[in-house]
Amino acid sequence: MGDHAWSFLKDFLAGGVAAAVSKTAVAPIERVKLLLQVQHASKQISAEKQYKGIIDCVVRIPKEQGFLSFWRGNLANVIRYFPTQALNFAFKDKYKQLFLGGVDRHKQFWRYFAGNLASGGAAGATSLCFVYPLDFARTRLAADVGKGAAQREFHGLGDCIIKIFKSDGLRGLYQGFNVSVQGIIIYRAAYFGVYDTAKGMLPDPKNVHIFVSWMIAQSVTAVAGLVSYPFDTVRRRMMMQSGRKGADIMYTGTVDCWRKIAKDEGAKAFFKGAWSNVLRGMGGAFVLVLYDEIKKYV
């Protein structure tokens, strides 16, 4: 094995451990966020049983479903990391060459900006093609509020994928795919635009203290996450459609989903669980910083 391949494998495995630790640590926040996002589209949660907010959700989950249910869907989320990273690594440079070859960042800023969006969107869409069923299963497992085996809609990752595939075919596992790609592009546009602006405002962008860099990254991630959050809400709601038939189908398509959420629930509904998303990002970053510190002594 060459040095390059060995280096990639080490980073890949170390990153996988870090991802597993950080995702597992913030999984309860992630589940709260997902439940707040999709409860209106859930057959299991009637109007009177809907969660009133983050605190209500955190208090009721262990009471109604057991403490370990905070980690429902986490395995799919951890597994998803490995193919996503491998695919990103495989496609990233190819898309950069295609969209950014010969573009000067300083002299052709807007072309560079557009190329960055295109390469990020293309790389994201390519890896999503392969890992989307895992993301789908993670959402459906997290949204499953049944307590015992008899009340659960799905009994695990494999059961979820098989049931939906039998019911709706491959299309059922890719509900909300289009809006997911749109969300990636919007996220990258916000992230790239805000990050560059923030760094450009510093007196010496090349010599920035690690804490300042971390604060900028946190702020930019939070802003980009909020800007693209409505797309995430719509895609999760679309995921909840799979396996439904006839009158049970709430949304006829993505456009109908946008329209009905705005009309029936108001614009605020697009941002349900957004605050927990910000907390999750901070928690994940903290765990990764901790992991880097531990790695120094191992």
UniProtKB/Swiss-Prot annotation:
Question: Where are this protein's Solcar repeats?
Answer: 6-98, 111-201, 212-297
User: What is this enzyme's catalytic activity, as reactions?
Assistant: ADP(in) + ATP(out) = ADP(out) + ATP(in); H(+)(in) = H(+)(out)
Question: According to the lineage, what is the superkingdom?
Answer: Eukaryota
- Put simply, this protein is called ADP/ATP translocase 1
- Family per similarity comment: Belongs to the mitochondrial carrier (TC 2.A.29) family.
Q: Which PANTHER family match?
A: ADP,ATP CARRIER PROTEIN 1-RELATED-RELATED (PTHR45635), ADP_ATP TRANSLOCASE 1 (PTHR45635:SF32)
List every position bearing N6,N6,N6-trimethyllysine: K52
